[in-house]
Structures are given as C-alpha cells and as structure tokens.
C-alpha cells in the first residue's frame, strides 16, 4: 500500500492542496500527502465512540482547498471497523463537497467476532474512489511487496487523475513479476488466515490477552479491536 499511497497523492495534489486524514493515523499517509506538496488535515477518531470518525469534525475541516478524504478501514492503529452507517455518512459528506475517497483496506481479511467489513466504494457508485489492499497482512508475505489499488465509481470525474497515475506508474518501468505470479494462487487457494482470527487462533488470542492486560492496569483503558491485533489505549 505504501508505494500506491505515495503514487496516488503525487498524481492528485498541487502545492497547498489539503487531504483529510484520520487521527490517530498510519503516519505514512500524512507523509505521502506532505511529500506530494499537500497538507494533511487530521480529523478526529474518538475512542469514546469505538474510534469511529467524528463526522462533525470532518465537516468543520473541509475548505475550498480540500481535495480528498482518506479512511483506513479496518483501522490502523486502532483496530476499529467502521459500520455501514458511519461509512454512509462519510460518503454523504464526500458527495456534498465533491471529494475523492481513498480507502486503505489492507486489513479487510482480518476481521474478528463475525463482524462484516464493508468497502466504502460499494456505497458510492457515483463518486470516484480509490481502494487499496494487498497480501502483506492477510497472507503474511510483506516482503513480496504485493498490493493493488482499485479505481471505481464515476471515472469521468477522475480522467486527468488517471492520466497522471499512468504517467507516474510508467516511470517504474516494470513490476515484480516473480512475486506477482503467486497472486492468483494466494487469493484463490486455501486461506490460512481464517485459522488465526477465531478463538484459539494466534491473532485472536493475542488480542484477547493484550486487551485484558491493558484494562487490568489502573488508569489504562483500551477499546477491543475488531480487526487484527492492534490496539490503542490511554
């Protein structure tokens, strides 16, 4: 996702343009916006509300320079999983202000407790969305550097942006063909990650242990993450 997030911001931003980024955030999103000449404007994700985005805070931070909003769902670093109704509110705001949506969904296969992951692009067929995912987390092969970005929705709104992406992508000359040869097998074959995210599985049990250990410390609280084993406490 890192290379593609950098690519996606470089193709979009002029100096001074703004992108809404969640806080707390995966810091490389802020870095990619900054490196592209933009300004990362952080919107609040509130622990008291299961770490969901504060929609009113998002609205307050939109200006005439705002070009896009980034969401990370499932979230890194909080482990929050955004429900359909929260995603719909974000879509409504993006539609009203004509914002592009960038959705980092690299943890979408690591959802626990029978919760459902909803891709925000499925709720916004009329908007231009860029969705990121890959095999690093779900298949535990980060060293292969296999990831992808999916452009969906109203591509007429992103014609110039797509041209910019193609130009920047061509500068890479070639992809990692040997690594890419495993994608079909990885996605279509046996999915071992399912054993890790259920009771008895390593990721599930790590989450349970750390969640309890944190909350057992006086003065420390943590919201139980719904995806992978990350957590943020206070």
Regions of interest found by a model, annotated:
Residues 41, 46-113:
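Active-site phosphate-binding strand-loop segment of PLP-dependent enzymes
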């Amino acid at each position: 996702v890192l290379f593609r997030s950098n690519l996606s911001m470089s193709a979009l931003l002029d100096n001074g343009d703004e992108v809404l980024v969640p806080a707390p955030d995966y810091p490389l999103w802020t870095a990619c916006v900054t490196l592209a000449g933009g300004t990362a404007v952080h919107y609040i994700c509130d622990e008291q509300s299961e770490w969901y985005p504060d929609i009113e805070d998002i609205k307050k931070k939109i200006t005439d320079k705002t070009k896009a909003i980034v969401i990370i769902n499932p979230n890194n670093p909080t482990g929050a999983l955004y429900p359909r109704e929260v995603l719909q509110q974000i879509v409504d705001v993006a539609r009203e202000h004509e914002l592009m949506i960038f959705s980092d969904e690299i943890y979408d296969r690591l959802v626990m407790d029978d919760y459902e992951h909803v891709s925000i692009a499925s709720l916004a067929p009329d908007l231009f969305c860029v969705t990121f995912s890959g095999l690093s987390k779900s298949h535990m092969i980060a060293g292969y550097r296999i990831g992808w970005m999916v452009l969906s929705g109203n591509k007429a709104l992103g014609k110039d942006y797509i041209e910019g992406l193609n130009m920047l992508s061509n500068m890479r000359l070639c992809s990692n063909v040997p690594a890419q040869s495993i994608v079909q097998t990885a996605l279509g074959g046996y999915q071992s990650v399912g054993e890790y995210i259920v009771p008895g599985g390593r990721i599930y049990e790590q989450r349970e242990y750390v969640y309890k250990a944190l909350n057992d410390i006086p003065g420390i609280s943590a919201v139980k993450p719904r995806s992978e084993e990350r957590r943020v406490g206070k």
